[in-house]
Curated annotation (Swiss-Prot):
It is an enzyme of class 2 (transferase). It comes from the Bacteria. It comes from Acetivibrio thermocellus (strain ATCC 27405 / DSM 1237 / JCM 9322 / NBRC 103400 / NCIMB 10682 / NRRL B-4536 / VPI 7372). It catalyses: RNA(n+1) + phosphate = RNA(n) + a ribonucleoside 5'-diphosphate. GO terms for cellular component: cytosol. Residues 623-691 form the S1 motif domain. The keyword Cytoplasm applies. This is Polyribonucleotide nucleotidyltransferase. Pfam families: KH_1, PNPase, RNase_PH, RNase_PH_C, S1.
Length: 700
């Protein structure tokens, strides 16, 4: 049955339509927020997937360019693979929903969001997140929601809920916040050095709005929600877990204690083999369940060390960071490089500087068309000791790259200050947790090594969490999580920033949400950590950005011309500018306001190109004398190119002081001659005189 539900959200109407579209899905809703329209669907398989030890959830966010009245570029003229923005949005939707599905559910669940219309002021990403939550909540798929979400801005110290496009442009932060009625389940933020306490206050205010949205969704579920289906639990049989725990508890406590990840992994592998062989006869044909019990025991032991004893499996205190080191200038030919190492996590970041014409062109549903600063993250198999080939970046790599990019963006100099396109690539060489935050630190080092005048160094670190499963009010937070703590812990709270404030946040959780106290402690820990890294590691490796750029980086020569002359400099079909580029080997970028940037590794070639551009853009006035080249001869005179791309006519009567019978008697094609501008007619044609120019020379 078709029904609609509406509420006011940030001064605009949010409307949910059910019972009309995509009725074969387990749950579907059409979300309208202003003129932004998104179809959200949730579908589950009837039976569990065989042979998996995880919950098989997939989330897609599909942009349709017709939503903004665009036809896709290229030859194919249809949408292809998801854009980077679509992948990042899918991850933002996935993270708050995944922890609220039953841990032992093994049925495939697919959430698909199709963007049908976008008005730019009302975020389709937010509409998709809300639509996904509602679609799952009203479906028969087991789910412990619902989840509400808002976007937070900050303008002149005031928190703005769901800012418009104009407000986003001047906002000091852009935070996607999701939560249930009592807890926060996801934070994704980019900010311009927002103090920790201001961010915490904004999260509190955002949660108050989320509670209203959750109440609204509960009302929808009450009216149209389906009963949840029964499913086959993938939980380890209690008998098997108890047997494994009794046999191997003390051995597991000993096995996990190691500073070195490889030593610990070998200990666990050896113990797993021993346990599996021991129980092969006791529980025949139950090897998968035995291995799941071993995993569960390892998790229990690691968490007990943290929660009960206040120590970690590598011997660190809860607030202790792994050994740190930083180096710059490792790679001789790149424009800038930095190596950041934290324990057994190691990231090598490299900077490449390019012309403004090298910016990334974006073809999506956003108004943003180009990107000048880019960060790419690579995670090869060898970084975790795996023998596998590289198949290009996946969703995780794209997400981690975007996080580090967002962290550095506020400190990147403006185009006016530093007119380069900047690309940073972070190569993960070793991974034992927090590689994205290692990429933030590596990027800072590489940018400073390249001579990019970043405003301040940025560091990143993460906080972890273990909550008592029997008493949710009892928990422990800790700093700088390693791989095993990320794997078995309840939270990965990543924060990057400068000494003065936060620039990026990304929070992943595995429980039903975070309380205000947990978030507060996480901010305190990460602030302490990032200040320590900036002062004691980054600034000791390189105290400030280099004054001199690499000799291999392109040099910039700039000039300013009259904007009305841009067309002349470019020439018909790009003829003039391409001629300059071909003759000098430079790259040229011309802004609409007349600013011209010339990029060249050869400074003399750059100066020559600048002279040619300035000559073309120069205003021509009667009386000026030029040394020109004859390019064409006719019966009535000679055409002379007196400036690059500019030519004029020397009439036969103006070739010499004596009478001239044939033009060829005086000049031929290719001759260089002095000419004087006599007049510029109404059509812009330039009349020249060799005779007058020669008389001026004789007078001297």
């Amino acid at each position: 049955m078709y029904k609609t539900f509406s509420m006011e959200l940030a001064g605009r109407t949010l409307t949910i339509e059910t019972g009309k579209l995509a009725q074969l899905a387990n749950g579907s809703v059409l979300v309208r927020y202003g003129d932004t329209v998104v179809l959200s669907t949730a579908t589950a398989s009837a039976t569990p997937r065989e042979g998996v030890d995880f919950f098989p959830l997939s989330v897609d966010y599909e942009e349709r360019l017709y939503a903004v009245g665009k036809i896709p570029g290229g030859f194919i003229k249809r949408e292809g693979k998801p854009s980077e923005k679509a992948i990042l949005t899918a991850r933002v939707i996935d993270r708050p929903l995944r922890p609220l599905f039953p841990k032992d559910l093994r049925n495939d669940v697919a959430i698909v969001n199709t963007v049908l219309s976008v008005d730019q002021d009302n975020s389709p990403e937010l509409a998709a997140l809300l639509g996904s939550s509602i679609a799952v909540s009203i479906s028969d798929i087991p789910f412990n929601g619902p989840v509400g979400a808002v976007i937070l801005g900050l303008i002149d110290g005031e928190v703005i809920i769901n800012p418009t496009e104009k407000q986003k442009e001047i906002s000091q932060m852009y935070v996607t916040l999701a939560g249930t009625r009592n807890k926060i389940v996801m934070i994704e933020a980019g900010a311009n050095e927002v103090p920790d306490e201001v961010m915490l206050d904004a999260i509190k205010k955002g949660h108050e709005e989320i509670k209203k949205i959750v109440d609204f969704i509960d009302g929808i579920v009450k009216e149209v929600g389906k009963p949840k289906f029964e499913y086959e639990s993938a939980e380890v049989p209690e008998e098997i877990f108890n047997a494994v725990r009794e046999y191997a508890y003390d051995k597991m406590r000993e096995a996990v204690l190691a500073v070195d990840k490889q030593v610990r992994d070998k200990n666990i592998d050896d113990l797993t083999k021993e346990i599996t062989e021991h129980f092969a006869e006791v529980f025949p044909e139950m090897e998968p369940a035995i291995k799941e019990a071993i995993y569960k025991l390892e998790k229990k032991v690691v968490r007990e060390y943290i929660l009960e004893e206040g120590r970690r499996v590598d011997g660190r205190r809860l607030d202790e960071i792994r050994p740190l080191s930083a180096e710059v200038g490792l790679l001789p030919r790149v424009h800038g490089s930095g190596l950041f190492t934290r324990g057994q996590t190691q990231v090598l970041s490299s900077v490449t500087l390019g012309a403004m014409g090298d910016v990334q062109i974006l073809d999506g549903i956003d108004t943003e068309e180009t990107k000048r600063y880019m960060h790419h993250y690579n995670f090869p198999g060898f970084s975790v000791g795996e023998a596998k080939s590289s198949r290009g970046p996946g969703r995780r790599e794209i997400g981690h790259g975007a996080l580090a990019e967002r962290a550095l963006e506020p400190v990147i100099p403006s185009e006016e200050e530093f007119p380069y396109t900047i690309r940073v690539v972070s190569e993960v060489l070793m991974s034992n947790g927090s590689t994205s935050q290692g990429s933030v630190c590596g990027s800072t080092l590489a940018l400073m090594d390249a001579g990019v005048p970043i405003k301040k160094p940025v560091a990143g670190i993460s906080a972890g969490l273990v909550v008592d499963e029997n008493n949710p009010d009892r928990f422990v937070t800790f700093m700088d999580i390693q791989g095993i703590e990320d794997f078995f812990g309840d939270m990965d709270f990543k924060v990057a920033g400068t000494k003065d404030g936060i620039t990026a946040i990304q929070v992943d959780i595995k429980i039903d949400g975070l309380t205000e106290e947990i978030i507060k402690q996480a901010f305190e820990l990460t602030r302490k950590g990032r200040l320590y890294i900036i002062d004691n590691v980054l600034l000791k490796a390189i105290p400030e950005p280099r004054k001199q750029m690499s000799k291999y980086a392109p040099k910039i020569i700039s000039t300013t011309i009259n904007p009305d002359k841009i067309r002349e400099v470019i020439g018909p079909g790009g003829k003039m500018i391409n001629k300059i580029i071909d003759e000098t080997g430079v790259k040229i970028d011309i802004n609409d306001d007349g600013r011209v940037y010339i990029f060249s590794s050869d400074i003399q070639a750059g100066k020559r190109a600048r002279s040619m551009i300035e000559a073309i853009a120069k205003d021509i006035e009667p009386g000026q004398v030029f040394l020109g080249r004859v390019i064409r001869v006719t019966s009535f005179g000679a055409f002379v190119e007196f400036l690059p791309g500019k030519e004029g006519l020397v009439h036969i009567s103006k070739l010499d002081k004596k009478r001239v019978e044939r033009v060829e008697d005086i000049v031929r094609v290719g001759d260089q001659i002095l000419v004087k501008v006599i007049e510029i007619d109404k059509q812009g044609r330039v009349n020249l005189s060799r005779k007058d120019a020669m008389e001026d020379e004789w007078d001297k």
